[in-house]
Amino acid sequence: MEFAEYKDYSPGDEIRHIDWKVAGKTDKYHVKQFEQSTNLKCTILLDSSGSMGYQSPFKKEESKIDYARNLVAGLSYLFLKQFDAVGLTLFNNQVVHHIPPRSKASHLKNILHGLSNFSAKGATAIEDVLASLTEHLPGRSMVILISDFLIGNQDIHKNLKLLRSRGLEVILFQILHPDELNLPFEGDTVFESLEDDTMVGLDPIDIREEYQKAIQEKIDHLKKISNGLGVDYMLLDTSTPLQQALSYYLLKRKSLTKI
């Protein structure tokens, strides 16, 4: 058991957990709370930039960020159920919100609260955020990075290599909408950036084949980088059942247990 925090004493609390030194200084009784010793500590990094807010303009369905929220909630539940510690960092071009890893079951409320109190906005700067966070992440732990990885990524190889050099297990979940994979629109269409004021008008049929080739090359590039560094990678579109992603994590967790 590891000490986690203090709480005010209330009837029913075990007297043996009262910190008498603190009581002597404050004239109040405080009880030590403990966490189960954790096998694994994980920080989930969630891209909350504007592009993650995309959802189909024609269908009522969840956006990429809503899909990601559900994924983070499911992963956090699994971590805590196994007495592993999990934390959450929201970012766009900077860290927006940070919840340190904890292994208490009640910590799920903190994660869910963090997930419900933001909207997808701002530009993306994954490389800058990773560079600033890496030295603060606990060594010999796990990092799960969730993003659409649509913008930037020029230095993602260097960032991931640095994470791996510190002994961190890394999992990338790339979340895309089927529209971003297939460009199914027809007729004259105006495309508006969710991260700046850029607007482009064109007929998708004129660029569909070239676009699909470019997006696939981008996916393949990220996958190749991941494989070369021993980073686990999974592509998810928003129609993919979350169970597939959660099962992928459980298999990874099982393999770590055997090491």
Model-based region annotation:
Residues 1-102, 142-146, 152-153, 158, ...:
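An amphipathic, basic-hydrophobic helix/alpha-beta surface used to engage anionic
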Residues 104, 148-149, 238-239:
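Short beta->alpha junction loops/turns
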Residues 70, 74, 124-131, 154, ...:
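Short, contiguous clusters of charged residues that form electrostatic/catalytic patches at enzyme active sites
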Residues 52, 56, 115-119, 206, ...:
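Short amphipathic alpha-helical interaction patches enriched in hydrophobic/aromatic residues
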Residues 2-5, 135-141, 153-259:
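Von Willebrand factor type A / integrin I
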Residues 107-144, 153-155, 176-177:
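Von Willebrand factor
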Residues 97-113, 228-231, 251:
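Short, electropositive alpha-helical surface patch
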Residues 66, 120-127, 150, 213-216:
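Conserved phosphate-coordination/catalytic loops
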